[in-house]
Structure formats: C-alpha cells, structure tokens
Amino acid sequence: MMSQTLTLCCLALVACVYGNTVSTNDTACPTFCPSIYKPVCGTDGQNFKEFASTCNLLSHNCRRERNSVQAYAATDAAWCSSEFVENLHEKLGNFKLEVKECFKPCSMIYQPVCITNGKYRAELANSCLLENFNCALQVSGAQPAELFRLLREEKC
C-alpha cells in the first residue's frame, strides 16, 4: 500500500513538472511562465521585441515555430531599450566635436557601425569616429555612463 502511494505521488510530481511544457522538436515549450519581470530583448533578424523573461521568449518562439515563422533570439538589451536617432550630435545638444585633443585622423572608408549608450542608438561611418565622438563627449563633461559603445559592426 505504501509503495503504491509513493508511486502515485511520484507520478503526480512528474505530471506537474512536465505539465508546464510542451515539446516541439527538441525545444521545450513552456505553457506557463512565472510572473517575474527580468526583461530579455529578442530579434528575428528584422524586428526587435522586449519579452518579460526568457521563459516568455521561449513560449513566444514555440507559437511562432508552429506557424513556420522565424523565431526570436536573445540579443543585447540596448536594441529594445534605446531610441534610434538620425542625427546624434544634434540630439545630444550640438556639443563641440572639433576638440583638438580628441582629433584622431580617421579613414574615409565607409564601414558603418551601430553604437549605443543605452538611451540612444545611432550609426557612424566607421569605428574610428566612435573614439573621436566619445572623447569630445568626455571633454564636454559627459559621465562614463553617457559614452557610446559598439553595438554591432554594421548599420543599425
């Protein structure tokens, strides 16, 4: 009698654990995600979307895969949290870019880079200009958290 009760309890536990996921191919698909907000940014190659958690991203992907739509992959959070601006210099208040101590000759080769400071996202013609830009920002009094970093070595 005790072994039957133990077996029944084990089966109930297994059913409870696996009852929250559905499998499509090799991917476990959660049907229930805890209400814990730990945002994750995802991309399907064209669009960026913020999900409440990794679990929500996986669940969303399972529904997309069933419809043969490209799944979202987790990516840098700055893609979802930053505003894309065309003219970064103007957006930041037209600070002085021509600072003697910041001048570093850059090639005229167009190799666009996408940069961000977490708040704004923009494109520069090449990565050398990013160094000059950040130097000029520092001279104008910008805090380290306001400086820009490379998001990817291509257009945004």
UniProtKB/Swiss-Prot annotation:
Name of the protein: Enhancer of split M1 protein
SUPFAM superfamilies noted in UniProt: Kazal-type serine protease inhibitors
Top-level lineage group: Eukaryota
Disulphide bond pairs: 29-62, 33-55, 102-135, 106-128, 114-156
GO molecular-function terms, A-Z: serine-type endopeptidase inhibitor activity
Gene expressing this chain: Kaz-m1
Mutagenesis / variant outcome for changing residue 5 to S: In strain: NVIII-1
Segments forming domain Kazal-like: 23-81, 96-156
Marked site positions, Reactive bond: 35-36, 108-109
Signal peptide: 1-19
InterPro entries: Kazal_dom (IPR002350), Kazal_dom_sf (IPR036058)
Species: Drosophila melanogaster (Fruit fly)
Effect of residue 104 to M: In strain: NVIII-m11
Keywords in alphabetical order: Disulfide bond, Protease inhibitor, Repeat, Serine protease inhibitor, Signal
